[in-house]
Regions:
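Conserved metal-binding segment of the jelly-roll/cupin
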Residues: 106-129, 135-138
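Non-catalytic, conserved peripheral segments adjacent to functional cores
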Residues: 1-109, 128-130, 140-202
Length: 202
C-alpha cells in the first residue's frame, strides 16, 4: 500500500533525501504508512533504525545544531503537529559539500520527511504555535558523545525563515525574534556552540 516519493541528494548534497509518503484519503480522513522498510529499500535506502524519539516545542524554539561524534546517527524526521524548518549541515570532511546546508519545511499538513545521513549536524526552528517532532535514529543516544555547532554561524549562513536579528559573534539568542515578535528560544547549551571552523569534523 506504500509507494513513497523520494527526492534524493536535495540541495546538491549527497545523501540528503526528502520523502513523501502515499496518503490515502476519503470522506472519513486519511491513512498513510509513515515508514515501510520494503519501500525504503526499493528506493535504495537501507538503514536499520533502533530508536524512535518525539519532542514537543513551542513557537520560536530552535533546537540544534546537534550530532554525535563517535556514534553518529542517521535520522529520519517529520512533524506530526505544527510546522518546523528543519536543517542539515554537511560536516563530512571528505565531502565536496562540506559546510553546506539544506533546509526544508516539515509540517503535519505536507507530511514530508527528511532523511539525514550520518556526518551531519541537525536542527530545527518551530514556526507554529506548537510542534510535535518525531525522528527515527540508527544508533542510541550517547550523552557523553554529544556535539554541536552554532545555529547562526555566518560561515554557514543558514537562512532561517521569519527570523530577525543581528549576529553578535556568538550563538546567543539575545536580540533575535520571529516576524511576529516571538523571542527566539534556545537552551543554554545550544547558545554555547562554536562555528564551523571550531566544530568537530567527520
Amino acid at each position: 500500500m506504500g509507494q513513497i516519493k523520494v527526492e534524493k541528494n536535495v540541495g546538491g548534497i549527497e545523501g540528503l533525501c526528502v520523502i513523501e509518503p502515499a496518503v490515502h484519503g476519503d470522506a472519513r480522513g486519511y491513512f498513510m504508512e509513515t515508514y515501510n522498510e520494503k519501500d525504503m529499500k526499493e528506493a535504495g535506502i537501507d538503514i536499520h533504525f533502533v530508536q524512535d524519539n518525539q519532542s514537543m516545542s513551542t513557537k520560536g524554539v530552535l533546537r540544534g545544531l546537534h550530532f554525535q561524534k563517535q556514534y553518529p546517527q542517521c535520522k529520519l524526521v517529520r512533524a506530526v503537529c505544527g510546522t518546523v524548518f528543519d536543517v542539515a549541515v554537511d560536516l563530512r570532511s571528505d565531502s565536496a559539500t562540506y559546510g553546506k546546508w539544506y533546509g526544508v519545511a516539515l509540517s503535519a499538513e505536507n507530511k514530508k520527511q527528511f532523511l539525514i545521513p550520518e556526518g551531519f549536524a541537525h536542527g530545527f526552528l518551530v514556526l507554529s504555535d506548537e510542534a510535535e517532532f518525531c525522528y527515527k535514529v540508527n544508533d542510541f543516544w550517547h550523552p557523553n558523545d554529544e556535539g554541536g555547532m552554532a545555529w547562526n554561524d555566518p560561515e554557514i549562513g543558514i537562512e532561517w525563515p521569519e527570523l530577525k536579528g543581528e549576529y553578535k559573534g556568538s550563538a546567543s539568542a539575545e536580540g533575535y525574534t520571529l516576524e511576529d515578535g516571538t523571542a527566539l528560544n534556545l537552551s543554554d547549551k545550544d547558545q554555547k556552540w562554536l562555528g564551523l571552523k571550531d566544530t568537530f569534523k567527520f
